[in-house]
């Protein structure tokens, strides 16, 4: 799926995005991510607090509202300038960037910037091969940093292009991608992320962390 296609899709969608997801698609991604991260922090006996948080594919800022109170500094990046404009109007972020995720992460890594939480809510479904992007995120996490994301799934293995032009991923594929990035999988839970034509969409909520944080239990 090309960068141009995704940018144009969401530039056109930006003005009605929040209403479409929350009112018509019953989107649950932000709440599911918040619950999964909170459970991981609770299991580790660590406070639900993050010095620097990165919202990948932040869109209009729907997901970050669930985390703003627990993040000192919040950075968002999205391919669509129109979505970024919507996010900026909410005043939730300390920094917003319009651009490609891979290029943004490469620049952050080169600048030695680090985040103790990175989230991607309903973002990776537009990426065929997750290995490069997950590895890039790992490169900007603190030694005990966390990556949490939602994706659609299917009953088979590997990656499948759906009729919606979104990708779905098998559980074993996700496990392999996490391991290849040098991250430790903390949870991989099935969940209905949203509905499509009133039918629940099968998804997975993933929480992973840096190998350096093996004490996380």
Explain the meaning of each model-derived region.
Residues 26-49:
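Conserved alpha-helix/loop element of class I SAM-dependent methyltransferases that forms part
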Residues 144-152:
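Conserved beta-strand signature within the Rossmann-like core of class I S-adenosyl-L-methionine
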Residues 195-217:
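Core SAM-dependent methyltransferase catalytic element
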Residues 119:
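A conserved beta-strand element that flanks and buttresses the S-adenosyl-L-methionine
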Residues 131-143:
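A short glycine-rich, Lys/Arg-flanked "PGG" loop and its adjoining helix->strand segment in the class I
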Residues 52-54, 59-106:
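Class I SAM-dependent methyltransferase SAM/SAH-binding core
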Residues 157-173:
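Acceptor-substrate binding/catalytic loop of class I
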Residues 184-194:
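Conserved S-adenosyl-L-methionine
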């Amino acid at each position: 799926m090309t960068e141009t296609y995704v940018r144009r899709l969401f530039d056109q969608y930006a003005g009605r995005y929040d209403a479409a997801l929350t009112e018509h698609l019953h989107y649950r991604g932000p709440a599911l991510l918040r619950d999964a991260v909170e459970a991981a922090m609770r299991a580790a006996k660590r406070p639900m607090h993050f010095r620097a948080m990165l919202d990948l594919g932040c869109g209009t800022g729907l997901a970050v509202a669930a985390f703003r109170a627990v993040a000192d500094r919040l950075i968002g990046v999205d391919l669509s300038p129109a979505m970024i404009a919507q996010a900026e109007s909410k005043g939730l972020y300390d920094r917003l960037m319009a651009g490609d995720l891979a290029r943004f992460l490469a620049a952050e890594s080169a600048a030695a910037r680090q985040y103790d939480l990175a989230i991607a809510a309903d973002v990776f479904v537009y990426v065929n091969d997750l290995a490069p992007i997950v590895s890039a995120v790992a490169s900007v996490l603190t030694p005990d940093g966390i990556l949490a994301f939602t994706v659609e799934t299917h009953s088979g293995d590997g990656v499948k292009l759906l009729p919606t032009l979104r990708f779905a991923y098998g559980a074993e594929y996700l496990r392999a991608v996490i391991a290849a990035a040098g991250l430790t999988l903390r949870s991989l839970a099935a969940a209905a992320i949203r509905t499509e034509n009133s039918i629940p969409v099968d998804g997975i909520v993933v929480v992973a962390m840096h190998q350096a944080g093996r004490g996380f239990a």
